[in-house]
Amino acid sequence: MPLTALVRQLQQVPLTGEVLERSRRPDRLRLQGASRGARALLASAMARCEGAPLLVVVPTLEEAGRWAALLELMGWPTTQLYPTSEGSPYEAFDPTSEITWGQLQVLSELVDEQGDGWQGVIVATERALQPHLPPPAVLADQCLTLRKGASIDLEELAANLARLGYERVSTIEQEGSWSRRGDIVDLFPVSAELPVRLEFFGEDLEKLREFDPATQRSLDAVDLVRITPTGYGPLVADALRANLPDQLDQLLNAEAMEQLLAGDTPEGMRRLMGLAWQQPSSLLDYLPGHTLLVLDERRQAMAHGQQWFDHAEQHHGDEVDGLLPPTLHRPISDTIEALEAFAGFDLAELAETDQHPNSFDLNSRAVPAYPNQFGKLAGLIKDFQREKTRVWLLSAQPSRAVALLEEHDCITRFVPNPGDQPAIERLIEQNTPVALKTKGTAELEGLQLPAWRLALITDREFFGQQNLTASGYVRRRR
């Protein structure tokens, strides 16, 4: 996590505390005029100053992927991307399992920590703020946490897994399945990146180990495993069976109705969430009350949200014919109002001249790129040093970058461990640029924050490197 040291430095600058104080004014603070990397650094630093978890709301899922890749470099205990679907919530088919499982991976962490203990960061689109989830208490009741040393009845565990939608198979290959061989249970929770092998002695859970589904070889030991339902369908079906609404016969065909009454979960349960619960929840209902909420590019987010709301409103009127309550979509103005109930601020890449009563211009600038022209780069770094600007070098090959700069009488130092705080502090006090190693596919480019006296130079400026990232959502697996 190479940018941890930069975030720590920003936390220590008095200006960060002053900006944080401005965010507590009645008018919501807008930080403008900074690249995505600068916005991510400042959002992380301000949240860490508060000791608060962070939710970043962005306009699109593509942008969310870019933000998540950046925030992973900044030292958060966990960084999660919360995926959402662009489709209408009243479609007869549920969203793809990849999206549902990605959501459950985030929610299992929030539910298990019971809110206040969670200290991670989540990136989501404004669609996550629309009602699309069961109430937190309902999901929490249905989640299982198996801990090492616990006493567990294997027959009861099998019944619980079947109730949550897990399929019993002979060999584990994908999420949502489990198998048993004597006192060994293999399980692939939909909220996990790897399956888990549970080894019992009688009813005592002796060992929990992750394993590779391709080779079936055991990997690292773990202390606990969180098991969520395989989707929201089983929860909706349970709620509907407890209180059968009159219009259910018109919404489900005879076969689906028979499945539901027999205890199974037919396809397309998500659209019935408004019948199962009077008011479905959004991601906001799962967050701790002290979470810092950051809205990136408000105008774009509201435009996307309004377009989706119009589509959902039309689809509800055309397809459902008044049989379903309109509880799975709400106007974007209501969504933003719910977001603003949390502490936080807005971010914008471009400086706007709309006379906003509480805006702060970050005046961030790009660093000129001189690919493979280390004489020019050395001169640029020396100029920064004369201005008492703290210079950070972030590279996949930092030793090479340091050696090439040294040929032009520009002394920099590579710190192999980004957590070596004393060494980094000593170099900063000596006004020596600090080089750190990075890896991954985050889209990061050089930036300057003049007000914080900070400059970051990356492989884009050193070698002309450009990172290409996927535009869609791909759930992370190890």
Regions found by a protein language model. Name each.
Residues 1-478:
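ASCE RecA-like P-loop NTPase motor cores
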